Amino acid sequence: MNLKQIAKDTAKTLQSYLTYQALRTVLAQLGETNPPLALWLHNFSAGKVQDGEKYIEELFLEKPDLALRIMTVREHIAEEIAEFLPEMVVTGIQQANMEKRRQHLERMTQVSLSHPSPESEQQQFSDPDWDNLAS
C-alpha cells in the first residue's frame, strides 16, 4: 500500500470536487446577476468537471474571467474547510464502518435465527417429560 500515492490521489479528487462546488456557487450567483452567462457556463461545464484542473484549463481558453472566479471561490472553500475536514473524514469513516458492521451482524444473526441448526432444533423440542415417555 503506497500511502503517498493514495494521499495524492485523494487530494486530486478533493480538488476536483471543490472545483465542482465552486462552479455550483458561481452558477447560483450568475443565475441571479447574469442568467445568460449562467446558462452558457452550465452548458460549457456539462460533463467536464470530473477533472477539475483540466476543466479550469479549458475554461481559461473560453472565458478567463470565469476561470479566475471559480478558482477564487474554490480556494476560499478549501481554506474554510481545511481546518476541520481531516477529523470529519476520519470520524465519518469510523461511524460508517461501525454502522455497516452493525447491520452485517444483525443480518448474520437474523439468518442464523431463521435457519436454526439441527442441534438447536433438537434442543428446542427436547423435553425431559416427553423423553421419559418414549422410554
UniProtKB/Swiss-Prot annotation:
Gene3D superfamilies registered for this protein in UniProt: Chaperonin-like RbcX (1.10.1200.210)
Name this protein carries in UniProt: RuBisCO chaperone RbcX
InterPro entries: Chaperonin_RbcX_sf, Chaperonin_RcbX, RbcX
Organism: Anabaena sp. (strain CA / ATCC 33047)
Keywords (A to Z) from UniProt: Bacterial microcompartment, Carbon dioxide fixation, Carboxysome, Chaperone, Cytoplasm, Photosynthesis
Any one GO BP annotation for this protein: carbon fixation
GO terms, molecular function: protein folding chaperone; protein homodimerization activity
Domain characteristics, as noted in the entry: The homodimer has 2 functional domains, a central cleft essential for production of soluble RbcL in which the RbcL peptide binds, and a polar surface which plays a role in correct RbcL subunit arrangement.
One of the record's GO cellular component terms: cytoplasm
Role, per record: An RbcL-specific chaperone. The central cleft of the RbcX homodimer (RbcX2) binds the C-terminus of an RbcL monomer, stabilizing the C-terminus and probably preventing its reassociation with chaperonin GroEL-ES. At the same time the peripheral region of RbcX2 binds a second RbcL monomer, bridging the RbcL homodimers in the correct orientation. The RbcX2(2)-bound RbcL dimers then assemble into the RbcL8 core (RbcL8-(RbcX2)8). RbcS binding triggers the release of RbcX2.
Pfam families: RbcX
Polar residues composition-biased segments: 109-126
SUPFAM superfamilies: RbcX-like
Stretch list, region Disordered: 103-135
Localization, UniProt: Carboxysome; Cytoplasm
Family: Belongs to the RbcX family.
HAMAP family given in the database record: RbcX
Chief localisation class: other
UniProt lineage: Bacteria, Bacillati, Cyanobacteriota, Cyanophyceae, Nostocales
Entry's induction text: Transcribed in light but much less in the dark in both normal air and 1% CO(2); the nitrogen source has no effect on transcription. Constitutively expressed when grown on fructose. Part of the rbcL-rbcX-rbcS operon.
Subunit and interaction comment: Homodimer. Interacts with the exposed C-terminal peptide of RbcL ('Glu-459-Asp-468'); binds 1 RbcL peptide per homodimer. Contacts a second RbcL monomer via its peripheral polar surface. A slightly longer RbcL peptide binds to RbcX2 with a higher affinity.
